[in-house]
Amino acid sequence: MELKVINTAGAETGEVISLDDKVFAAKVSEHAVYLDVKSLLANKRQGTHKVKNRSEVRGGGKKPYRQKGTGHARQGSSRSGLMSGGGSIFGPQPHGYDLKVNRKIKRLARRSALSSKAGEGRIIVIEDFTFEQIKTRQFADILKNLGLDQKKTLVLLPEHNEIINRSGRNIPVLNIRVADQASTYDILDCQTVVMQKAAVKKIEETLA
């Protein structure tokens, strides 16, 4: 697969970059994508939810009324889950939601996500981002030049760049990642993937 390289003004540079078909034109495995995204979202959960059961609610040591003769169902404690103010029956307790996915499946899922975006024509290769200082307005103008100012966009960089990260972090539609650290969810949760030219090689080295 080949894509034209463009600059930050949105104009073609005349250069064409060849993308590895193993990464950008692979067969899409929906099941691998499902497993990886499910794992990523589950692992974000804290699992700290907690309610009190009848042994943890304050009070309730005394039998609320006599066993027989009241016409009511028998009760041994006013903190039974059947009564107002009582403990919760089978309520949520703290536990982990971690799901393990093999590295092979994770790589397959990322290849599938990138191939899906490439097949839809939603990958853009940009020559370079040149920021001399932190400037959100400059980044917003670049997105506007690319026609992405109203679209959720993932920008992939070859390495961490503090100036670029801080320039783009206040733009709601923008998500910036280092190329080899972008997850399947990052790729799917955007309308367009913008890759810096140098980031293409890093992705191919990681996933090919």
Curated annotation (Swiss-Prot):
This is Large ribosomal subunit protein uL4. One of the primary rRNA binding proteins, this protein initially binds near the 5'-end of the 23S rRNA. It is important during the early stages of 50S assembly. It makes multiple contacts with different domains of the 23S rRNA in the assembled 50S subunit and ribosome. The keyword S-adenosyl-L-methionine does not apply. One of its GO terms (biological process) is translation. InterPro entries: Ribosomal_uL4 (IPR002136), Ribosomal_uL4-like (IPR013005), Ribosomal_uL4_dom_sf (IPR023574). The keyword Cell wall biogenesis/degradation does not apply. GO terms for cellular component: ribonucleoprotein complex; ribosome. Part of the 50S ribosomal subunit.
